[in-house]
Amino acid sequence: MVQSIERTMKIIRVLISDEKQAWPISDLASATGLPISTLHRFLDSMIQYGLVEQEPVTKHYKAGYTWMEIGFTLHNRINFRYVARPIMEELAQEVEESIFLSVPAGYDSIPIEKVESPLKIRIDENMGERIPLTIGAPNKAILAHWKPEEVRKVVAAQLAPALQQPFLDQLAHVKETGYAISCGEKTEGTVAVAAPIFSYGNQIVAALSINAPSFRVTEDRMSFLIERVKQKAATVSAKIGGV
């Protein structure tokens, strides 16, 4: 296993070097010190996973775009939480409510960052708690931008048949308007307003939400909260390479 990893890394390091855009198999063998028969075996497996591409005409090899996707994903996971934090603090001061950052985790979401409301009566959530994706505004903001086939799997797993189409209709509205609202879905007496956060390639990576006691959210204030959470989510998206 260790030897296979070492050989794979040798191949990748050569393919991503600045020396050539694409490599003939003979040059790749010289650069890696690996036999051509071994190279063919490794390259065939790597092509299946998009880690390597073979040019159709020349048959030369180059690094695949999967590496770019992996790099962007890792970059976002490492950095976007820290990018979001000061923006969340600004939002908490503007609206005087608790602000949360949630990320998808399988068919659930996990709150990974929060800024508490400066007011005495405020909403709290447990960081790291798994919440089913069909519950709450942040999750609707995330799920509305998943691929339809994945959405159907989540909905089928978490909702009774009679509830599935109404929920899908909600998601369509969320995607169209750019925000989601929930009232007491997770915690009675609370309201949440959320907007999606996107990274490179318009990939949904998180949701930003405002959570408030329902008695503080009038119709006029709801419009204000929607406008602010959408604007701040868009700011985070822009800073991590999204739309």
Give, region by region, the residue ranges found by the protein language model.
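Amphipathic alpha-helical effector-binding/dimerization core
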Residues: 58-154
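Sensor-regulatory modules in signal-transduction proteins
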Residues: 197-200
